[in-house]
Amino acid sequence: MKSGRGKSCGKLWKAPRRNRLISVAHSKQAALGFRVHSGWAALVAVRLEKSAPVVLVRQRAHLVETFTYEFRQPFHTAGKMPISQARDFIERVRDKAQRLAHRAIHGLQSDLQKQGMALKSCGLLLASGKALPNLEKIIASHALIHTADGELFREALLHASRRCGLQATAIKERELLEQAVQAFHLKPAELMRRVIELGRALGAPWSKDEKLATLAAWLALRASLKGGGRTLSGGAA
């Protein structure tokens, strides 16, 4: 996705057909799924209708105020600074990401509530899911820098989800399809066919981001309805 130089991204990024609410007749429980990138995330909200998922909302939200490399790759940027300055910079980016994530999630809650929906849970896709070391060790390792950039934005979404009262389910992305197959008793091909079909009525974008976020939301909703779910912990810097 192309970035605008110096462009303010305090509001949700919008494009034709990208954000759509489907009216419903009465109150239902909904769940959000997140797939995170550097500085932004794909969000999909679903509910169940006759045990099948229905997409309620599909958005892409910015998690940085200025959508440039400096802020989208904060640990890369911090690695070029003295350690005290780097620590302050990371904290500023983290704080802003948490605020923007909360704005996005709380806004969705309000919109869905007006449609008679109760947003109560979320599914967050993880990379490795491993805890990161301190900042000094992170910026000394190029591999850890890449990992930490993504984790900062995942943690921001988790923090915001908790503030909004959502039950969070953390799912390693490489295990997502296997978990979904076991949970919904569908073969992988049939499962993905259903997810692809969900996007046909919505139009673009319905990329890998939205498809995986949908599966994460579906699993989170199932966990919430069954009274389960597991919350991600740990952090960087």
At which residue positions do the language-model features occur?
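Acidic, proline/serine/threonine- and glycine-rich low-complexity intrinsically disordered segments
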Residues: 3-10, 15
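Phosphate- and other anionic-substrate recognition elements at nucleic-acid/protein interfaces
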Residues: 13-16, 21-230
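Long, low-complexity, intrinsically disordered segments
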Residues: 233-237
